[in-house]
Amino acid sequence: MEIYKLSFIIIVLFMIHEFEEIIFIKKFIEKNKVIKDMKNELFVKKKESYPSTETTSLMIAEEFIILSTLLFIASEFRMYEIVLSLFIVYIAHLVPHIYDALRYGKFSPGSRTSFIIFPLGILIIWNVILNKEINFVIFILCVIIIGFLMILNLLFLHKISKKIDKYLQK
């Protein structure tokens, strides 16, 4: 698969999944916050501190800009290792959605698309690894570094989400 096609597929799948979260998250929390068995569910356990829909959208927009920029740069330099690393980190983030849906027996925001995108993503990643020359040392380092930086970014965004909420409500 050509690197630009791979990058395009990644960004489209990312946004479809994120739209599902944005659209359904508040309704899901409201509906399930009083159900005792759901108290540890991914979204419900953070119901008191979960950002507004507007803030969530802004946080996703920031992630979209970063992901798009990195995919563009990596594509320009034909660095499949970086493109695949971004995809793997994104695919890994789907696992908690799948786990919660299986654990609680109901779909949560993002879990529907996770069940579709996860196996598709694994197939795409596997296909690229088999058909392109990948430097596995660089690839593993990129997965670790990008994964670490994406987690830091997400933690940072959640840390400042209350400030963003206040700013957006002015």
Give the ranges of each region predicted by the language model.
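Cytosolic, membrane-interface loops and tails of multi-pass inner-membrane proteins
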Residues: 21-49, 160-170
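Membrane-interface helix caps and helix-loop-helix hairpins in membrane proteins
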Residues: 76-77, 98-108, 131-133
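Membrane interfacial helix-start motif at the N-side
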Residues: 23, 42-60, 100-104
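Hydrophobic alpha-helical membrane segments
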Residues: 88-97, 108-129, 149
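Terminal transmembrane helical module of multi-pass membrane proteins
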Residues: 122-170
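N-terminal signal-anchor transmembrane alpha helix
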Residues: 1-26
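Core segments of transmembrane alpha-helices
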Residues: 55-73, 116-122
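Transmembrane alpha-helical segments that form the membrane-embedded catalytic/substrate-channel core
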Residues: 15-22, 90-101, 147-162
